[in-house]
Amino acid sequence: HGLLRRQRQMCIRDSFIKYVDPKMYSEYLLERYKKSAPATPRPKFDFKPAFEDRTILDDLKSIKQLDDEHPAKQYVIGRKIPSEFYDKLFFCDKFGQLVNKVKPNTYKTKDHPRLIIPFYDTTGKLFAFQGRAFGNEQPKYLTIKLDENKQKVYGLERVNFQRQVYITEGPIDSLFVDNCIAAAGADLVLKNKIPNDQVTYIFDNEPRNREIIKRMYSVVEKDYNLVVWPDDMRHKDINDIIISGTSKAELLDLLNKNTYSKLSALTKLNEYKKV
């Protein structure tokens, strides 16, 4: 009877947390899962280069392969990430172990799970991967490059440079806009692949962030298109806009209505900035 009572109390507590705070519920589930998760299998030793795709992702399960109740899948569902990308995102319960497998002795702090976002080049070859924290671990994003000569650009394997190209800051934001890549927090050099007026930059909505404002001015100076968020925008980024209930079509309409270039972009940016 005591065991049944404890199980009943746990169910009530789970339901309460889920009802009051869905985000906290996802983090709470993840914490419970971590305690009961089996240890990561020992890596197989062979003589092939450590950079090969299979040694990095082969031991990981994609989000698509996880049970619907798995905390990592619940997190992705909660962020409203389109299901077409579930097989392109992975769960890693020991991120530090994964990093040290390809770059020994890089990660020495306390290990924890992360969402793995792989970066592929235009030929489909893996050249980097990003770990996104589920909880409050810092930094929130950690990107590991396997090829130091390549820029940290996400989404190159599916972008069409003959069409209008959108560029966001974060990889997750790029999943909600067609033909979109992410600069992953770095200044992107497009190497003349595409006319400047065929490129639209979308930064996070942070008018008080000096670094972002500086980069926005740089985009305008290079004659790229720039999205300048309206004054009544209360969401921080594209993912927040989608989570609020906005559809992809409505998002595209919002972006198009707030896209500027040259003098009009400069005028709007001067009004937008709060620094």
Which positions does each model-derived feature cover?
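Short, surface-exposed amphipathic charged segments that create phosphate/polyanion-binding patches used
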Residues: P195-V199, K236-E250
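Single conserved hydrophobic/aromatic residue that forms the stacking wall/gate
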Residues: H1-R8, I12-D14
